[in-house]
């Protein structure tokens, strides 16, 4: 198992979670997957997360709401949001919320990895 920085993946689609986890681990990152935002928030691993990748559309709490909740709780984690249903309103909300990247599914593996590296730099600079 990779020993690199921990990336949390929150998506209600199991295939997306598994594929993203495999990609990140092959690039040297550690990854933890969660089907719901609440599962991440209850996890003991939350304090170790260096980057969050979350789906915009999930039941109960969206990826953007999760990001905003973490920021409001003084647990700001550099966040990458992904969606299969892009629209200008949610993209503007994501930018205003200072997410690292807003990815439209399907996206290239290199695009996601570039966003993760950017998030890691932001995490290191922020001293989290």
PLM regions with names:
Residues 58:
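Receiver (REC) domain active-site loop signature in two-component systems and cognate sites
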Residues 33-51:
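Acidic, metal-coordinating helix/loop segments flanking the phosphotransfer/catalytic sites
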């Amino acid at each position: 198992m990779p020993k690199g920085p921990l990336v949390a993946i929150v998506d209600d689609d199991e295939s997306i979670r598994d594929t993203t986890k495999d990609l990140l681990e092959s690039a040297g990152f550690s990854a933890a997957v969660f089907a719901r935002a609440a599962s991440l928030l209850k996890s003991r691993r939350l304090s170790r997360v260096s980057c969050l990748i979350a789906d915009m559309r999930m039941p109960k709490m969206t990826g953007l709401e999760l990001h905003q909740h973490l920021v409001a709780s003084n647990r700001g984690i550099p966040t990458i949001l992904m969606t299969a249903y892009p629209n200008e309103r949610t993209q503007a909300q994501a930018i205003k919320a200072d997410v690292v990247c807003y990815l439209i599914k399907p996206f290239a593996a290199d695009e996601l990895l570039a966003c993760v590296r950017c998030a890691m730099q932001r995490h290191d600079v922020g001293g989290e």
